[in-house]
């Protein structure tokens, strides 16, 4: 089977499912998986920025090229220029469709309250994919799944619960781990984790945030996210 560039008009049923208004003219590129280089899938799983160029003969896909940061210099000028913008974007040309996929930072906030809400609001403003999780069992799974592109922020006055969340973040690969709370809370968490044979806390920023004499929830959120941005940029 060959890939196709499809033109459809969204009907009422499709609008209900997709959220796209009824009557919208939409274009979809459908390409069989075997048209892609096998290395494409590991790159997408690892959330590596890539550019996909589907070459067209009218509406039929004739070839698919995939570029990453190491090979984008060999792409055509339009693809390289779109990739250089550093954001997910798409362009449709008569002879090809260019799809640039840039991963979005995931931010998991384990805790609740005004500070968590302020961090979530500012994180969303940054364009990050934000999850505020209050249930410990859900937080542990999310924290452990983070990548070096992502950030984890731990808060809470209950030592065992917040320590479990901190331990889960350390098990994952989050590029930034921030722990809110006093120095005493930081030590209490460190002691709890030590009983679990977790002693390397070098990746943890605690108390989290840069020193701007923050006091309000929004100021604290700015302080913490500024530190997170700086650390993620290093990665």
Label each residue range with its predicted role.
Residues 145-160:
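Rossmann-like NAD(P)-binding element
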Residues 160-161, 167:
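Cytosolic regulatory regions of ion transport systems
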């Amino acid at each position: 089977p060959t890939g196709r560039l499809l033109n459809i008009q969204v009907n009422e049923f499709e609008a209900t499912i997709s959220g796209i208004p009824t009557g919208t003219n939409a274009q979809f590129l459908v390409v069989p998986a075997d048209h892609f280089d096998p290395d494409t899938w590991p790159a997408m799983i690892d959330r590596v920025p890539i550019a996909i160029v589907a070459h067209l003969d009218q509406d039929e896909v004739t070839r698919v090229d995939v570029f990453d940061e190491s090979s984008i210099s060999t792409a055509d000028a339009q693809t390289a220029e779109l990739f250089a913008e550093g954001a997910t974007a798409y362009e449709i040309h008569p002879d090809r469709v260019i799809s640039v996929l840039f991963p979005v930072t995931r931010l998991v906030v384990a805790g609740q309250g005004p500070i968590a809400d302020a961090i979530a609001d500012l994180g969303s403003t940054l364009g990050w994919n934000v999850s505020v999780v209050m249930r410990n069992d859900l937080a542990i799974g999310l924290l452990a799944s983070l990548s070096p592109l992502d950030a984890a922020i731990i808060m809470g006055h209950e030592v065992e619960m917040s320590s479990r969340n901190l331990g889960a973040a350390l098990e994952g690969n989050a590029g930034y781990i921030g722990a809110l709370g006093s120095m005493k809370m930081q030590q209490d968490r460190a002691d709890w984790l030590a009983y679990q044979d977790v002693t390397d806390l070098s990746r943890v920023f605690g108390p989290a945030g840069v020193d701007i004499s923050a006091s309000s929830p929004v100021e604290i959120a700015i302080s913490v996210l500024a530190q997170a941005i700086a650390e993620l940029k290093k990665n």
